[in-house]
A protein has these predicted regions:
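Nucleotide-activated donor-binding/catalytic signature segment of Leloir-type glycosyltransferases, i.e.
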Residues: 1-22
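Active-site donor-sugar recognition loop in glycosyltransferases
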Residues: 22, 40-43, 65
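Short alpha-helical segment that forms part of, or immediately flanks, the ligand-binding pocket
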Residues: 24, 46-54, 70
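Acidic donor-binding loop of glycosyltransferase active sites
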Residues: 27-42
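Short hydrophobic beta-strand element within catalytic cores of glycosyltransferases
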Residues: 32-34, 50, 57-63
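A charged, aromatic-enriched C-terminal amphipathic alpha-helix characteristic of glycosyltransferases
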Residues: 83-131
Length: 136
């Protein structure tokens, strides 16, 4: 990452650890967000939903074939998955060109990822607790 930042200092900015508020504000200013997917095949990181909620184009670098995040990136209309194990630079260039200055509004993101919203989580917890306490 440092090599790319040094080579393209006006285009790529790498931030060390920052607060959530600063990270979110910085992402809102970005033209494109970059996600480096996990190498674990049993975990979907919550950060991807933060990325989607901003509505910016997201380039996802997928490191493993069975990445559990892939299905979410496939649903998000402004995403491109760059398979690190089988890259296609031409498609990435097309995506970046076509996604320039485009956004997805929050209502659309909330609809696409209804099962990742706070409301869905709260309803699920409420249902589980209701089921537990109704069994007694």
């Amino acid at each position: 990452m440092q090599a790319f930042c040094a080579k393209y200092p006006d285009n790529i900015i790498h931030h060390e650890a920052v607060s959530f508020d600063r990270a979110f504000a910085t992402m809102e200013k970005a033209d494109v967000l970059l996600n480096l997917s996990n190498t674990l095949d049993n975990m979907v990181p919550s950060k991807i939903f933060d990325y989607f909620s901003i509505g910016k184009p997201v380039v996802n670098v997928q490191k493993i074939k069975n990445c559990p995040s892939r299905e979410y990136f496939d649903r998000y209309p402004l995403s491109f998955t760059f398979e690190d194990f089988a890259p296609n630079n031409y498609d990435l260039k097309n995506f970046l060109h076509n996604a320039k200055n485009k956004t997805v509004n929050f209502e659309t993101v909330s609809t696409l990822f209804k099962d990742a919203t706070i409301e869905f989580a709260a309803a699920t917890v409420e249902k589980v607790l209701t089921d537990i306490f109704n069994d007694k």
